[in-house]
């Protein structure tokens, strides 16, 4: 499966909620879903057909997958990893996804979207525990320190993104804006993750 190349705003409209895929635009009135909160396409307003149980499960899987910017193979691999862990599979899946470096960068506020975070990581702007990491899928562990590389501390993209961030937006993260450093305190509990999705539907879908 290739990367999605059409307008990502259409994905939000299809799910009828913000997936925060477009960076700063998602936080303004320019976000298309503010004025067109219906499915894209010629018949977007008139789509009222009954959705099957499978359709509901598939829609939820697609939504979570798109939120985190993953391909189907990647997403399925994370699910298989979640199954092998102790606890509730759906919650394990979300916890794994929250540990991805691109997601942590986004949550810390160093990037306006996970997509932008991936670009910044690939361009070698971040360090984890003083080691340069250029792999967006790198899984951050409890106690890891994520910081902007010294030569990258003047990047406008990072500073513009930080303007929308509070000092302690998430209980499992801390951020020092002065040094552009963040700490991953612990793997978050599912209840703390601001994700409007039902991961149990994904478990049901993949269990068929």
Feature-to-residue mapping (PLM):
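Short, well-ordered loop/turn sites that connect or cap secondary structure elements
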Residues: 120-121, 140
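Beta-rich strand-turn-strand
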Residues: 111-114
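Ferredoxin-like alpha/beta domains used as RNA- or RNAP-binding modules
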Residues: 1-108, 135-208
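Glycine- and Gly-Pro-enriched alpha-helical subdomains that act as flexible
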Residues: 124-134
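Glutamine-centric residue-chemistry signal
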Residues: 24, 116-119
